[in-house]
């Protein structure tokens, strides 16, 4: 009896199953065996498969899972569909983890707040993914108290902050801008990470007199933009914000 040859979709499904039912797009491209694929752009083929196959569903941008294991995967992520609280918690941890991974590739020391160390990122605790949950002693105590609440910070080799990231899924963007205002004396980048639908709100809240000193320094990054850089980590120097 001859074994049926697996097509490309079958291979992607098998990899997802072997990975526990889910994988990032980046991980799929690392694990799938492309040796028998008659294409010069296998990554594009994988993207088409995950987007079009009814066997696969999107958990978040860049993160895909098997429909047959939906319940198991969502339980692992502590993610309940149509539950805003669990969606907020998962989304926050997911993008914190992605920013940590990008930071590490850029040879930055990565930090997330101690109160976030037990948040999940692809089945792992953020405290096990980031370099530290204890903020380096780079300034006065009153400055550190403000800085240590920032969602993700990258530090350079001198342990000075190079980039501050705040993830705004549903919370008030003004609170993050206020943090950045207090940290403006550092030679660092300031980033709001959110869904593209919040760009107009970001602009409205940034361009007020209070935030004039930082309005040209704060950038808005969409979830898709962050994931796009993560998926091209080997080309990260070509994918700067």
Residues covered by each model-derived region:
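Charged low-complexity interaction tracts in eukaryotic proteins
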Residues: 1-9, 19, 35-82
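Nuclease catalytic cores
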Residues: 75-113
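A short acidic, leucine-rich amphipathic alpha-helix
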Residues: 27-32
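Active-site metal-binding core of divalent-cation-utilizing nuclease and nuclease-like domains
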Residues: 83-88, 104, 112-159, 231-241
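Short capping segments at the starts of secondary-structure elements
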Residues: 16-24
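Charged, structured surface patches that assemble and position nucleic-acid processing machinery
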Residues: 210-241
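Pre-recognition alpha-helix immediately N-terminal to the DNA-recognition helix
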Residues: 10-14, 98
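Catalytic cores of nucleic-acid endonucleases
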Residues: 130, 136-150, 156-222
């Amino acid at each position: 009896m001859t074994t049926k040859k697996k097509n490309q979709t079958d291979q992607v499904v098998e990899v997802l199953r072997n990975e526990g039912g889910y994988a990032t797009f980046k991980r799929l491209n690392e694990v799938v065996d492309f040796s028998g694929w008659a294409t010069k752009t296998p990554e594009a083929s994988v993207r088409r498969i995950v987007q079009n196959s009814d066997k696969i569903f999107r958990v978040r941008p860049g993160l895909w899972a098997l429909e047959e294991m939906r319940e198991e995967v969502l339980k692992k992520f502590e993610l309940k569909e149509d539950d805003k609280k669990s969606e907020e918690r998962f989304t926050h941890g997911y993008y914190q983890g992605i920013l940590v991974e990008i930071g590490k590739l850029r040879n930055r020391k990565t930090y997330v707040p101690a109160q976030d160390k037990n948040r999940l990122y692809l089945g792992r605790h953020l405290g096990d993914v980031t370099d530290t949950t204890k903020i380096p002693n780079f300034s006065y105590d009153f400055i550190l108290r403000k800085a240590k609440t920032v969602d993700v910070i990258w530090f350079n080799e001198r342990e000075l902050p190079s980039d501050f990231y705040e993830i705004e899924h549903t919370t008030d963007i003004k609170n993050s801008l206020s943090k950045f205002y207090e940290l403006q004396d550092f030679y660092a980048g300031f980033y709001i990470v959110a869904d593209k639908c919040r760009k107009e709100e970001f602009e409205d809240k940034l361009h007020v007199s209070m935030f004039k000193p930082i309005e040209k320094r704060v950038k808005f990054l969409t979830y898709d933009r962050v994931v796009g850089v993560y998926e091209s980590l080997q080309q990260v120097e070509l994918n700067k914000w």
